[in-house]
Structures are given as structure tokens and as C-alpha cells.
């Protein structure tokens, strides 16, 4: 076993990587509130796992979406638990993200030289809100349908470009299959990919610059 480890160590310098991860200096003023960002990440990972599990049963069509969600909740093995955890962790992710933003702002974590870390965090906050908007519509029940209709209708108040924006969001002049398809694609592919990219940037900058000092 040691020979196998030595082989990998010679090529990848595993020990140096492990030392860098485990020996990072943690300032003495750090408390439990500095864990809010990590909790938000944990919620996101739970979202990915449970969301992926539901894609095996969910059908993104206006005629089958609601019935497929009912199937997940009533017939699929542990489907009710997986969807419930998905919903609870979604609410928890939003709450932890908001508290994390407040913590960073109140402790001055956005100041020089951490401006870019703050910017990526703001982008992540917008992406988190977008998850909520797109995911809310996927069951395609009365609440989801009218929520989509209202949200996608908001840009219509913008002069000149309002109507084209509404049609871009909906995929057509009215809410229908094109809208559900777009929201499903955003929720399951585009937003998770963007979130993963910006989270990686966020964490790399934190690793590089360290945790901000006390006020």
C-alpha cells in the first residue's frame, strides 16, 4: 500500500496539498457565524443530490409535470422524503445565504482587498433567488403557473424592450410548454453550472486572501 501511495506522492505531491488544506491559519475572532457560508454550500450540495434524484421521475411537460410530482410524493420509493428534503434545504439555503450576506457586511468582509469576493457573492445571491423562481414553477400547479405568469410579466413595464423580454422569458407570447421547458433547463442545468463556477471562484479567493480580520 505504501508503494502505491509513494507512486502517487511522487507525481502529485499529495502531502503538500494536504498540508496546505489542513494548516491554513484561522484568526482567533472567528466564531460560529463564520460558518454560514459553509452551511449554504452544504444546502446547495443537498439540492444537487435530491434534485438529481427527482429528475428520474419528473416530466417537464404541461400535461405530465403535476402528475409526475404526485407520483414522486406518493409512489416512488422515498420520493416524498427526497422532495421534502429538497424543499426544506432550498428554504434553508436562502436563509443561510441572507444571514451570510449580513455577517459579511456587518464585519466589513467586503472591503479592500476582498471586493471581488463580495462581487461573486452577490452574483451567487442572485443565482440563489433565480433557483427559487424557476423551481417554484416546476410542479406546474396553480401556484406555480400563476407565479410564473406574474414573474415573467414584470419586464413588460420596461419601455421598448419590455415585450421582447417577456417573450424571451416565456418562449412565446403566453405562458405554456415553452416556458416550462426554459425554466426546467435553467433550474437543472444553467443555474447549477453557473453556481458551481462562481462558488469555485468565491472559495479560491477566500483561500487566497484568508478570512477578514475583526472590525
From Swiss-Prot:
Top-level division of the source organism's lineage: Eukaryota
GO biological process: photosynthesis; respiratory electron transport chain
Coiled coil: none
Residues involved in heme b 1 binding: 100, 202
Binding sites annotated in the UniProt record for heme b 2: 86, 187
Residues spanning the membrane: 32-52, 90-110, 116-136, 186-206
Compartments where found: Plastid, Chloroplast thylakoid membrane
Principal location: plastid
Alphabetical UniProt keywords: Chloroplast, Electron transport, Heme, Iron, Membrane, Metal-binding, Photosynthesis, Plastid, Thylakoid, Transmembrane, Transmembrane helix, Transport
Similarity field: Belongs to the cytochrome b family. PetB subfamily.
Record note on quaternary structure: The 4 large subunits of the cytochrome b6-f complex are cytochrome b6, subunit IV (17 kDa polypeptide, PetD), cytochrome f and the Rieske protein, while the 4 small subunits are PetG, PetL, PetM and PetN. The complex functions as a dimer.
Physiological role: Component of the cytochrome b6-f complex, which mediates electron transfer between photosystem II (PSII) and photosystem I (PSI), cyclic electron flow around PSI, and state transitions.
Name of the protein in its database record: Cytochrome b6
Organism: Oryza sativa subsp. japonica
Lineage: Eukaryota, Viridiplantae, Streptophyta, Embryophyta, Tracheophyta
Gene behind this protein: petB
Amino acid at each position: 500500500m505504501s508503494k502505491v501511495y509513494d507512486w502517487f506522492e511522487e507525481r502529485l505531491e499529495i502531502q503538500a496539498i494536504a498540508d496546505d488544506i489542513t494548516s491554513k491559519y484561522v484568526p482567533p475572532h472567528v466564531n460560529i457565524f463564520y460558518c454560514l457560508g459553509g452551511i449554504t454550500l452544504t444546502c446547495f450540495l443537498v439540492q444537487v443530490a435530491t434534485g438529481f434524484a427527482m429528475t428520474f421521475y419528473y416530466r417537464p411537460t404541461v400535461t405530465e409535470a403535476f402528475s409526475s410530482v404526485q407520483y414522486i410524493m406518493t409512489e416512488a420509493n422515498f420520493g416524498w422524503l427526497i422532495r421534502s428534503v429538497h424543499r426544506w434545504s432550498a428554504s434553508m439555503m436562502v436563509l443561510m445565504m441572507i444571514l451570510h450576506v449580513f455577517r459579511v457586511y456587518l464585519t466589513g468582509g467586503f472591503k479592500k482587498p476582498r471586493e471581488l469576493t463580495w462581487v461573486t457573492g452577490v452574483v451567487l445571491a442572485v443565482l440563489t433567488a433565480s433557483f427559487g423562481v424557476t423551481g417554484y414553477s416546476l410542479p406546474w400547479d396553480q401556484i406555480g403557473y400563476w407565479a410564473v405568469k406574474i414573474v415573467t410579466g414584470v419586464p413588460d413595464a420596461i419601455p421598448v424592450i419590455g415585450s421582447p423580454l417577456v417573450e424571451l422569458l416565456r418562449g412565446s407570447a403566453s405562458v405554456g410548454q415553452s416556458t416550462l421547458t426554459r425554466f426546467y433547463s435553467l433550474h437543472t442545468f444553467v443555474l447549477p453550472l453557473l453556481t458551481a463556477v462562481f462558488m469555485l471562484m468565491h472559495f479560491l479567493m477566500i483561500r487566497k486572501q484568508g478570512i477578514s480580520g475583526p472590525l
